[in-house]
């Protein structure tokens, strides 16, 4: 088996592109390499990078997040998803030692220590020669318990630049150079598309990934990478997670170019709780599939205003269903879609209109980072399947705000950290809809899939329907 963590000296060093390229090169069976099973992971709460890594590796990418999970849960997640893979590739976030606190307790280095992983350091070498040596030596000396097993030099200015860097690193350090990736206008163009193009546009995504994989395979010593990351320590898979034996409930899930932000383990947790997920397309389908509940996750609805607005039949059907009492949950982009309208770059587009407020896009993030929420007595899932719901840890990342809500709007959460809708509240409640800017994650501290599925079941019973009317 082979396991390694890809990190960098600072953010925006190109580690995502390198990670995607390595996942593709090692799993594709091309570039002089046999096809291997590569299990990708991503540190932190990000949605976009894992989507690309999933396509590149051909296996779902799973997030590992210190803020949302205790150490024991991270170890279990890593073992559960990585035990049957030949290669476990973990992409870090930000710099190797960057974190939320002074001790770096949630840094990439902390994850490498926890999971006993060698680190491959991606270095943006633009404008550097001899200074690369103290940069590497400083990273080694800062924490001797971290094994920097190799470096990949990125954005080089030509073969002469590469030769100088290799000579300096060989002379002053004991760290091998695993690869040297030249500055490449075409690769830079692909990198810019990564955050803009919906990865679930499969054909286009695979074309970009193939281009990245070919370039990385040609400039990184894949055999040396596998050599320094080899381990004989097997991962013991944890016990199988319990599954519901109740009759399944059908939950319609929006998944298309506009909406695609779902954690792989959240979808699995919905299934384990007894949900049958039925996917639909907000851009092309004219009505919801038959369902007992509705889920609309995050995405980029602002990039598809014309198509979403033009699909009047589906918008009307979604509104009828929610106003008729269909249990529904929406996050971020889903909340935007369910509002009256979205305003962006001088353009205004009508949306579903079940939330009596409007969305305005901004140039800078309105809410960005980790969130702590406290559910209140209005929360429709509070107590679903348990005696109560403690404070929830989650995250948000939105460039929009929801405004012109009625003064008597009911909310599900008090915001203890973060922004939410107005800095104080999140989780708009309408009928049996809960719509928030916050992205929840299924963890030991937030079992939202089981609670939502139980809520859907409760809504299907006559007693529940009689005691909890569909109030606006």
Features from the language model and the residues they span:
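ATP-dependent carboxylate-amine ligase catalytic core
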Residues: 2-115, 119, 123-150, 159-163
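A short helix->loop->beta-strand "cap" motif at the edges of active sites that frequently abuts
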Residues: 117, 175, 323-327
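C-terminal and late-domain segments of enzyme folds
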Residues: 54, 112, 245-247, 259-269, ...
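Cysteine-nucleophile active-site neighborhood
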Residues: 277, 301-381
């Amino acid at each position: 088996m082979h396991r390694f963590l890809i990190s960098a000296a600072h953010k925006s060093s190109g580690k995502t592109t390198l990670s995607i390229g390595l996942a593709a090169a090692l799993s594709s069976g091309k570039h002089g390499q046999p096809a291997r099973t590569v299990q990708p992971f991503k540190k932190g709460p990000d949605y976009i990078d894992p989507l690309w890594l999933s396509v590149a590796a051909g296996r779902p990418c799973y997030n590992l997040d210190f803020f949302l999970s205790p150490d024991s849960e991270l170890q279990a997640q890593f073992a559960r998803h990585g035990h049957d893979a030949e290669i476990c590739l973990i992409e870090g976030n930000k710099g190797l030692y960057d974190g939320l606190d002074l001790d770096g307790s949630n840094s990439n280095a902390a994850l490498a220590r926890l999971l006993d992983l060698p680190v491959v350091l991606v270095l943006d070498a633009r404008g550097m020669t001899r200074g690369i040596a103290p940069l590497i030596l400083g990273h080694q000396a800062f924490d001797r318990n971290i094994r920097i097993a190799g470096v990949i030099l990125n954005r080089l200015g030509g073969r002469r630049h590469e030769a100088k860097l290799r000579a300096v690193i060989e002379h002053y350090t004991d760290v091998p150079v695993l690869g040297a990736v030249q500055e490449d206008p075409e690769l830079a163009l692909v990198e810019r598309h990564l955050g803009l193009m919906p990865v679930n546009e499969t054909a286009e995504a695979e074309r970009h990934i193939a281009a990245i994989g070919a370039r990385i395979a040609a400039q990184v010593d894949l055999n040396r990478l596998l050599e320094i990351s080899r381990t004989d320590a097997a991962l013991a898979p944890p016990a199988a997670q319990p599954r519901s034996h109740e009759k399944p409930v059908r939950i319609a899930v929006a998944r298309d170019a506009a909406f695609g932000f779902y954690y792989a383990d959240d979808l699995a947790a919905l299934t384990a709780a007894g949900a049958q997920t039925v996917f639909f397309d907000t851009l092309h389908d004219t009505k919801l599939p038959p369902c007992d509940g509705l889920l609309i996750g995050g995405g980029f609805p602002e990039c598809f205003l014309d198509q979403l607005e033009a699909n009047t039949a589906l918008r009307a059907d979604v509104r009828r269903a929610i106003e008729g009492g269909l249990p529904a949950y929406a996050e971020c982009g889903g909340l935007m879609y369910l509002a009256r309208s979205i305003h962006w770059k001088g353009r205004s587009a009508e949306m579903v209109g079940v939330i009596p407020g409007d969305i305005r896009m901004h140039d800078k993030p309105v809410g960005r980072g980790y969130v702590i929420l406290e559910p209140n007595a209005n929360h429709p899932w509070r107590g679903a399947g348990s005696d109560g719901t403690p404070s929830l840890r989650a995250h948000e990342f939105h460039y929009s705000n929801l405004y012109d809500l009625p003064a008597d709007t009911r909310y599900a959460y008090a915001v203890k950290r973060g922004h939410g809708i107005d800095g104080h509240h999140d989780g708009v409640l309408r009928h049996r809809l809960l719509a928030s800017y916050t992205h929840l994650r299924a963890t030991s501290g937030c079992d939202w899939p089981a609670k939502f599925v139980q809520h859907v079941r409760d809504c299907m019973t006559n007693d529940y329907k009689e005691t909890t009317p569909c109030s606006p």
